[in-house]
């Protein structure tokens, strides 16, 4: 799903992980290993206020017992999604 955050169209790391058939943990590990390829206009971490606002709008962000996120999610802009595809497919 595409969301609007900070006046930018973005996708959540968890949605992209499902799309690429990897875990969110693996996706974020690859991003950390390739940080120079992801400048701030490609991706950013949501702050707590942004995450709570987004969570209140999205039924798919499950907050049940044992289903909460340990960390605030990363979101990727269109350029970030393209770079992520390159990084994940190069493994």
Name each model-derived stretch:
Residues 1-91:
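Basic, low-complexity intrinsically disordered segments
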């Amino acid at each position: 799903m595409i969301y609007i955050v900070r006046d930018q169209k973005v996708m959540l790391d968890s949605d992209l992980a499902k799309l690429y058939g990897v875990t969110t943990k693996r996706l974020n590990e690859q991003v950390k290993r390739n940080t120079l390829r992801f400048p701030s206009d490609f991706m950013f971490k949501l702050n707590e206020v942004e995450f709570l606002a987004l969570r209140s709008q999205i039924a798919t962000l499950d907050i049940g017992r044992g289903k909460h996120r340990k960390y605030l999610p990363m979101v990727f802009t269109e350029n970030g999604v393209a770079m992520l595809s390159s990084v994940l497919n190069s493994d």
